Curated annotation (Swiss-Prot):
Gene Ontology cellular-component annotations: cytosolic large ribosomal subunit
Keyword match Metal-binding: no
Domain of life, source organism: Bacteria
GO terms for biological process, alphabetical: translation
Residue positions assigned to the propeptide: 1-13
NCBIfam families named among the record's database cross-references: L27 (TIGR00062)
Name of the featured protein: Large ribosomal subunit protein bL27
Gene3D superfamilies: 2.40.50.100
Membership in a protein family: Belongs to the bacterial ribosomal protein bL27 family.
Intrachain S-S bonds: none
PTM statement from Swiss-Prot or TrEMBL: The N-terminus is cleaved by ribosomal processing cysteine protease Prp.
Organism: Mycoplasmoides gallisepticum (strain R(low / passage 15 / clone 2))
Amino acid sequence: MKKIWFHLDLQFFASKKGVGSTKNGRDSNPKFLGAKLADGQQAKTGQIIYRQRGNKIWPGKNVGQGKDDTLFALADGIVRYTKFLGNKTKVSVVEQSK
């Protein structure tokens, strides 16, 4: 009996399609964080001074902090940014005398 040899050539195809472009096509909406009023600008009561996540800037006199860490004016006056404890920044609203 004569032996017969078979040459098998196997090819494996991808079981999952390469979908990098569809998986990467997302982007979040802008949050518009940062300073809304600069040092020396006039602030009215309730006006947003600084939008932030966490305490990048700390509230000082006449400045309140919302639950999303937004800083806002509690009184009419001039916005002042000052450094304290070395590298921390505090924002205050200085009331003007009438």
